[in-house]
Amino acid sequence: MSINRNISKLGGALRKDKIARELDDEIQTHIDMETDENVEGGMKPDEARQAAHRAFGNVALAQEDSRGAWIYRWANDFAADLKFGVRMLLKNRGFSAVAVISLALGFGLNTTIFTVVNAILLHPLPVRDISGLVQLDTVDSKTHVTAANFEKMGLSYPNYEDYRLQNEVFTDVVAWMNTPVTWSGGAEPKQLQAYLTTANYFDVLGLRPALGRFFLPGEDTHPNSDTVVVISYALWANKFGMAPSAIGKPLILDAIPYTIIGVAPRGFKGTVSLAAAEQTWVPISMYSQMLGGFSIDAVHDRRFLAMTAFGRLKPGVPMAQAEASLKTIASRLETEYPKENSGRSVALSSLAEAAVGINQHEQFTLAGAMMMGAVGLVLLIACANLANLLLAQAATRDKEMTVRAALGAGRGRILRQLLTESTLLSLSGAAVGLLIAYWGRNILWSYRPAFIEANDVDLALDSHVLLFTLGIALVTGALFGAAPAWKASSPDLADTLKAGGRGNSVGWRNNPIRSLLIVVETAMALVALVGAGLFVRSQINAQKINPGFESEKLFVMAFNVGALHYQEGPAQQFYRAAAERAASVPGVAGAAIAANFPVGGGFSRTVFPEGQDEASGFRGTLTVTNSVTPTFFDALRIPIQAGRVFNDNDRKETRMVAVINEAMARHFWPNESALGKRFHFFGDTEMREIVGIVSNVVVIQVGEDPQPMAYLPMAQEYVPFATLQVRTTGDPQASISTVRSVVQQLDSNLAITNVQTIHEIMSDALWAPRMGAALLTLFGGLALILAAVGVYGVLSYSVNQQRHEIGIRRALGAQEGDVLRLVAGQGMRLAIVGLVVGLAVAAVFARLLVSLLFGVSAIDPWTFIGVTFVLLAVALLACYIPARRALTVDPLIALRYD
């Protein structure tokens, strides 16, 4: 027996482990046969086996040589397949170009969307082992909440300290809060964000400084003395030119010099994924220098949930176990501090989710999945088109396949060659798709909302994006190449096409694969169009939503007088002067000061009506508050429903008053007038009398259910950060620069920020539905075009294959209408089946989009009916063109070849 012959057979094995087993079996068989021959020659069995082993030689070396021979042959065959595949693609340049462009479009869209999803959802923070980091939130069972934003809240600093010291599930726990600060080191004051953190912040995240050092243990324990700061890489690059000498230099924040001790690593901007790139971090011990108003006292008050906390789990500790352990501590704290912690417990969530926003993560995930699904449909339709093209091409390669089979090529060998060709097409499309994605991500990101700067999110085509593109390219190559390759490699391929080029019509019986592809293409196109239609309708409805105030001819700007250490008296004088100066500018109809931006949320406090409080077990309601000056309601044109609004007589020394919205009135006093009623806030026993009721306005986000809102006089409820809201008689853009100038003249060190028209604010608020509508319309349109091209291509091929049949029918007297019905009917029957399937699938998946839609049902009949008619019309057009071409068939010429 020849061992080389056996090794040669092994070279055809498909699996490595199978090859190894067969190789061992063959070697053992050879030795056994040699042993038997030696025994027959007179040797003893043991001697015979030893002699056989000596004759064979080194078994391990033979195994290694055999494996090397197999690998060499496999590599040689693979190289030959690649070479032949490239030659075939170059030979059919037109087909290859169409295929690569179609795939590149699909890959480019998929990679573009995945780049954004990867940056925001999959890898939101550049920290070590993010899976081990979890955020701690307070859940208050005794406080009624009216919005999902309030279901989970932060921790009080004293509670944080208890959790940190008493837990046994974390290696360490961090607390932080952020606040706007004024940087005074440039040409003009600028607002930055400062993280007030515990000293272990960077250590728990597992970060190393790009330059300098981070906080030392204990560097957060000296109130007003730990004047050190860590700056972000972007701030270092933009403000210090990446100079190493920045370490040790002062950074003036809120008029106080902080010594720069370190630079955070590139790409890190804190534990909020959509935060600005320019950030600063200072020790929590500097809170009294950076916070204003009652926030100064809130840091050490167990009642106020001012801190965000996260910890790193100990190895092997699951999140559920950690949460159960912390709930035990929470119960103990509730017993020890019943007034402050009654009804409060703790909940954990992954920091990866919390970085996007605990309440927004689900929305972002759903939106990301929807976009990936939409572009995935486009790619799948492109795959179906290519599969049909390859099926058509397979008929032209019938002779080639027959010759290859006759020369000894097995079906597996032919399959591998054809799949190599389809994979080469796919990889070529992926390469071009990466170029599309490189430009596409920048184009897509240029439509981001104004509050996100271009460099706030790193949309790099990193290793994750490249691996994703490579993965879908390989899967796609197999997907659109499998059916054509299987059909082309069939031993009976020659029987499917009769001599002379006759073919079959399109239909389940004659061409089941191609018919199925048409149905799938049509169904996927309809699903994509339904999604686009729902979002377009949603966007139209969102734009019609009344915010509750007149949004035209209105602009705002913000400033933080607390950053310049204004006391309340001078700050109130500044506010009055700013509003008066703004109102005196030509073209300005009115101006007011308010704590909150329109559609910007606000500080929330728990409200208790008179006669009810936490001691009586009453469940208070978390309510958004807004401190405003008397001219606020007139400037914003908020309708007064009852009572009055504030006036100059509402001062600190007079009775405490409030104006509430209709939602708050209905919530607390549903069957009676709220005028004259009184309430107090959690932790504050002083009663406030309701003197007026105004219409509801959008508080947190467009499309929300009306939220309870309490307006307080700025003179009675001072805040050190405020917005100037200005009503104009004409275009607000014409007055912005003048108003900004007159306010800046009051204090040249004041940073004036967030200068926007209300139109811009509303536009930002509707950014997500607007982008969703635009992108899904684009993707749906592409899906429609690709599906139409697919139907057209299949029917065109069918007409070519049926020329003899059509010629015979025409010769026997068939009219033009008969031929049109014959050809167009083939495609329309399949398109209608696809529509039915698509409607069923769309009805199921549309229900997942309910939370993303404004004022439109997921099963909106107008959308489904409209999309169905559009797709039917396009399908009919795609069928009609080949059908018209069938009328040009000359019966005499067609029959001449029969």
Task: Identify the residue ranges that each predicted region occupies.
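Interfacial "coupling" helices/loops that link adjacent transmembrane helices in transporter permeases
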Residues: 382-426, 789-831, 835, 848, ...
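Negatively charged linear elements and acidic catalytic determinants
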Residues: 1-101, 312, 346-347, 357, ...
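Membrane-proximal extracellular/periplasmic loop immediately following the first transmembrane helix
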Residues: 125-180, 304-310, 540-542, 546-606
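Mid-to-C-terminal secondary-structure elements
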Residues: 5-6, 180, 193-217, 226-369, ...
